[in-house]
Amino acid sequence: MNLYFRDYHAGSRLALVRRVDAPASGNPPVLRSEEAGGYEQLRLARDAACFASDHAALAPVNREAWQQLADGDIITVNEEGLVHRLFSGRERAATVYLTGHCNSNCIMCPVSDEERRTSGGLADEAMMAYLQMLPAEVRHITVTGGEPTLRTALFLRTMRTIAVRFRQADVLLLTNGRSFSLQGFLQELLHLCPAHLCVAIPLHAPEAGLHDAITRAPGSFVQTNEGIGNLLAQGIAVELRVVVSRKNAAYLPELADFIVAHYPEVHVVNFIGLETRGNCARHLQALYLDAPAAFRAVQPAVLKLMEHGIDVQLYNFPLCAVAPGFWEICRRSITPEKIRYAPACGECAARPYCGGFFQTTLAMTKPHVQPIPRTALFMDNRDTQDAHASERSGREV
């Protein structure tokens, strides 16, 4: 969303969007403070906008983008008038972004070094206000960064607020897991923890040398594995994430063996295709595998994990790159505003079910696309039955 306000002088704001019909004067009606729940609101009409607290009038530069704002959106406006949407009022899923800073510097991270240095997230009290502005009926919350645990006090305060205010919500924490190698920190989280928490942690290789070469953080393999073990020992659900690149593709079967041996109780293992921006774009030649090659690399590891009763999913894999027997584990994992399709995708019968490509990946790599015919969607695929036979029998025991 490319939205900013012309000649903006109203200062940084965090606001709840309310769309209203414009009165005859062309100015939006005044919003009383009690209607705003004590928080700032941005009142939008067809041709006018203002903040509720001081009636500061605003002039949007791109009116088409302005119309993308929905009632119930939560936004920030910076000193220059640039608008960023934190929450979409059309959704019942929320993202809580604590910081861009990270104690790893993964070679394939889609965030650039500059973004990590400069993106600090909301101030503490603004974050608390944001959590209170979210609708109570939110059913999924993702807590993310950077490395969200680096803002230790805010992280713990955030998790406790979520635990109290959103008791029924599924909560996904994206972290490198290293902070949970510290028992004291883990106990602080457990003191008041969201009831439906899953912690998603990347594991890049079955041994320290390669894992640490990918994270570019010496000692991270040991800390991450200690964190995973500590979380599982406390009964916290753990999702392992494996980002597939040239660096680790040849070692994925060994990584599957490692997971089976050490973490058989893991909630799910997700194999993830690259997003070619940030560090990944900078090191593209050393990292990039096209989606068909990435699938060929993950297939033996997927089967091994399934044979041992471990759930597996594929993120960021277009369906045409994946054998039909594995379509059922592919997820539409790319956020809607980042999804793009190649011209050839228009001929594909599977497009409504396919997650497509990242915009940057499509632009930088020009991936080959093989449209799937309609008949392929309804075939009785014997390979599917063979590939998953042992996985099914293992679950039935």
Role assignments for model-derived ranges:
Residues 160-163, 250-267, 322-339:
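Short, electropositive alpha-helical surface patch
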Residues 110-123, 136-151, 163-182, 193-225, ...:
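Core AdoMet radical
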Residues 4-12, 323-397:
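Flexible mid-to-C-terminal extensions adjoining Fe-S/redox cofactors in radical SAM and related proteins
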Residues 196-198, 222-283, 293-316:
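Conserved C-terminal portion of the radical SAM core fold
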Residues 36, 46-95, 113, 325-332:
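N-terminal [4Fe-4S]-dependent radical SAM core
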Residues 153-160, 181-191, 250-258:
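Distinct, well-ordered alpha-helical segments
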Residues 1-40:
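Short Lys/Arg-enriched alpha/beta "domain-start" segment
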Residues 87-124:
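Canonical Radical SAM [4Fe-4S] cluster-binding loop centered on the CxxxCxxC motif
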